[in-house]
Amino acid sequence: MTFRMTFGSLASAAASAALVVSAPAQADDAADLASAVTALRAITTMRADFIQADTRGQRVGGVLTLKRPGKIRFQYEKGVPMLIVSDGSALTFVDYEVRQVQRWPIKNSPLGALLDPNRDVGKYGRVMPTGSDRIVSIEVRDRARPEYGVITLVFTRKASAPGGLELSSWAALDSQKRRTIVSLSNQQYGIDVPDNAFRYNDPRSPVRR
């Protein structure tokens, strides 16, 4: 299945050629970057529907659940025997079809930008042009650690969202240049999410983790 190959996207110019950016534009970019960090940090819990698409055009949906600090769950739609979940320390990919479990430190995944925005977005983020005042796009890349991949977070300005920006999608590019795009809808914030929502049934044993 193609999405097994693209999981790493979720879980793992020379100065002379650079464009000259005006001081007001730099100030606006700094404000947007700070707003994005504030918006992500303001999300205590969130649930949303998601659509995940890869470069081959394959799409699959499901429900995303997030809880700070560091917990996230991608529950795929019925018929997709996979699960992505973080318990706050490691990101786990569970493939129930082949009874396999893989784990990564969350900081080694592009998703670390979602779960630790102060460290990743604030330090490594840069504002990208969008052509719309309503859209803010932040590319997060640690150039010293290319194996961590790149994630581009896209926000829509919305007064009712935490921090005034609603996370609407992101594109993750892993170190093998595999790209995955995740689009969110029906976002709900501040909902009750128990910690056991981030446990999973280990297909290798009868033990629930």
Residue ranges and their predicted role:
Residues 63-115, 180-183:
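An acidic-aromatic
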Residues 43-45, 59-61, 67-69, 79, ...:
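Extracytoplasmic
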Residues 26-34:
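Cleaved targeting-peptide boundary
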Residues 20-24:
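N-terminal signal peptide c-region/cleavage motif recognized by signal peptidases
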Residues 122-124, 129-209:
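Gly/Pro-enriched, hydrophobic low-complexity segments
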Residues 38-57:
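A short, Trp-centered hydrophobic/proline-enriched beta-strand micro-motif
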Residues 1-14:
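Bacterial N-terminal signal peptides that target proteins for export
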